[in-house]
């Protein structure tokens, strides 16, 4: 914890970059992430996470640092709600960290620790019924303990069979729309107040927004953007920090309310926001194979 505090203070002093947030663990519940040198998981039980966070909190308080300490960068939403491919010591994370009855792991009254959970959207994106249901369950558990949520990492994985899995860079709208649908569900159903993509630049895989083509000497090359990058920009360019999401209701041509009409997983999906400066942003996704017409009212 002294090392982390030294890093946060040192970077701000040397480079003028202030860390508003830091998370000391990445995917502590990801059993697949702990073997070999190619992944970056940091295996830990809930008790180990809680002990480390409390020690880090004490160090920050002693140094009068206001950097916020985040938990828990879960590899899978299911580990936040219950156990998934690991035991109870790494599961039920929302309850473990933010229910006062969890005396060994409760962090709700720990200085510099916001009532906020971080999780990764991997592996719960298919089938479409699971995409929605899992995020509704997550939101229900978060609301029960008055906890906020950030989606802090995801990309295309092998289970995303609708677009051929993760292999092979895709510059087309196919992957762009697929990811936009995930963003929509994470924000609208899970209530994510922040959303991050895994990687900016990569090779022949669907994890990069930009594809790099490096020359053999590794000294030069070229880059190519993707529609995915621009799809993400439809959110990040227009929805600014401090924005508030607005409810969206959909009506048919006769004026009848369409239940759940803001989310047609194979058609139109709509979310709306008001920025801190009073401006509005509306993000519309058309997953259908044909053009759609609509009218925006009361905005």
Spell out what each predicted region is.
Residues 1-20, 24, 32, 39-47, ...:
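N-terminal catalytic cores of secreted or lumenal carbohydrate-active enzymes
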Residues 9, 38-182:
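Noncatalytic carbohydrate-binding groove/subsite architecture in carbohydrate-active enzymes
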Residues 15-21, 64-68, 112-115, 144-148, ...:
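Loop/turn elements at helix/coil->beta-strand transitions in domains of secreted/extracellular proteins
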Residues 22, 117, 186, 232, ...:
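Conserved, mostly hydrophobic/aromatic
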Residues 24-27, 71, 119, 151, ...:
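Conserved beta-strand positions
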Residues 148-239, 246-251:
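Aromatic/acidic polysaccharide-binding cleft in carbohydrate-active enzymes
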Residues 237, 252-296:
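Carbohydrate-binding surface patches
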């Amino acid at each position: 914890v002294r090392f982390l505090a030294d890093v946060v203070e040192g970077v701000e002093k040397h480079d003028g970059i202030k860390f508003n947030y830091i998370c000391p663990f990445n995917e502590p519940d990801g059993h697949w992430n702990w073997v070999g040198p190619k992944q970056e998981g940091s295996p830990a039980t809930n008790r180990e996470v809680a002990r480390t966070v409390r020690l880090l909190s004490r160090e920050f308080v002693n140094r009068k640092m206001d950097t916020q300490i985040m938990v828990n960068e879960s590899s899978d939403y299911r580990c936040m709600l219950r156990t998934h491919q690991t035991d109870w010591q790494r599961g039920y994370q929302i309850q473990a960290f933010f229910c006062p009855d969890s005396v060994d792991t409760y962090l709700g009254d720990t200085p510099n620790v916001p009532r906020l959970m971080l999780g990764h959207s991997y592996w719960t994106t298919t089938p479409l019924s699971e995409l929605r249901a899992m995020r509704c369950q997550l939101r229900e558990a978060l609301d029960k303990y008055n906890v906020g949520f950030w989606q802090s990492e995801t990309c295309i994985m092998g289970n995303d069979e609708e677009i051929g899995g993760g292999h092979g860079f895709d510059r087309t709208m196919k992957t762009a729309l697929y990811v936009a649908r995930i963003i929509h569900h994470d924000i609208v159903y899970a209530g994510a107040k922040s959303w991050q993509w895994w990687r900016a630049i990569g090779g022949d895989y669907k994890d990069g927004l930009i594809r790099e083509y490096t020359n053999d000497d590794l000294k030069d090359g070229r880059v190519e953007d993707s529609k995915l990058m621009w799809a993400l920009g439809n959110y990040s360019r227009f929805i600014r920090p401090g924005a508030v999401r607005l409810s969206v209701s959909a009506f048919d041509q006769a004026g009848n309310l369409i239940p759940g009409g803001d989310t047609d997983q194979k058609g139109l999906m709509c979310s709306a926001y008001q920025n801190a400066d009073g401006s509005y942003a509306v993000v519309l996704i058309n997953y259908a194979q044909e053009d759609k017409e609509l009218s925006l009212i009361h905005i």
